[in-house]
């Protein structure tokens, strides 16, 4: 996310890509051409040094493991009165799984577990849920029973959470929430967002509008260093064709 006007964006594009004939910048297309790599770096340097920016880097595999813990582990502990999220335990356990899981459990088998989890969340059928439980049981799960025991033992709380309508492994909303959290911190007052046309944004348009319209004063703290306060300073989110806006 970059706080920049169309005129300034056009000027930077002309300055760093004077020979470019395309109506819009496409990173993947430019990055494939060696002659454009240095201008890309210089453009990024100019934007980062001269304008307010929010950059969000997401490791999708780590995020998937976090989601696995949210739905295939946490409900088991909640049912027994344990706060799985206390002191960032979910992040610590996700980091452990991400780092040692492939070595301790076998790379292929661990990958199969994550794939089975994605399929179970998407399909929500008894067959897909059984396949997830079987994938967990094929692992040497007693090596990490606190993370793998609930699903390996077929915890009904976890299976019910995974089968809940609306539960998804889509990372788009996580990214949107993270960007919004940081933009709220950086913005001195009301602001609006213009976004390139996106199916993901259309999917979450109604939810974003509910966020924007929320008037009750409340703060949600995601971690020790991240929180978001309502009402938002964000006033609107609109989609535009990037061919018509630099």
Label every model-predicted segment.
Residues 57-246:
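A two-mode feature
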Residues 1-33, 38-55:
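An N-terminal structural lobe/cap that precedes and organizes the functional/catalytic core
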């Amino acid at each position: 996310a970059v706080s920049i006007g169309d005129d300034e964006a056009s000027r930077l594009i002309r300055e760093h890509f004077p020979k470019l004939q395309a109506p819009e910048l496409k990173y993947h297309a430019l990055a494939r051409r060696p002659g454009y790599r240095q201008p890309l770096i210089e453009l990024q340097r100019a934007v980062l040094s001269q304008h307010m920016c929010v950059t969000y880097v997401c490791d999708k595999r780590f995020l998937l493991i976090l989601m696995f813990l949210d739905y295939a582990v946490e409900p088991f502990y909640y049912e027994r009165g344990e706060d799985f999220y206390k002191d960032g335990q979910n992040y610590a356990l996700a980091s452990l799984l991400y780092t040692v899981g492939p070595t301790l459990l076998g790379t292929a088998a661990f990958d199969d577990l994550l794939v089975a989890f994605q399929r179970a969340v998407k399909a929500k059928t008894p067959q897909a849920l059984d396949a997830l439980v079987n994938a967990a049981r094929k692992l040497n799960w007693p090596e990490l029973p606190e993370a793998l025991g609930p699903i390996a033992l077929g915890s009904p709380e976890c299976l019910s959470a995974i089968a809940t309508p609306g539960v998804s492994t889509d990372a788009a909303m996580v990214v949107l929430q993270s960007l919004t959290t940081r933009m709220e911190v950086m913005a001195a007052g009301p602001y609006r967002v213009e976004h390139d046309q996106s199916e993901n944004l259309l999917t979450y348009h109604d939810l974003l509008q509910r966020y924007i319209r929320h008037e009750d004063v409340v703060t949600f703290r995601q971690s020790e260093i991240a929180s978001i306060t309502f009402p938002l300073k964000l006033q609107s989110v609109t989609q535009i064709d990037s061919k018509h806006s630099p």
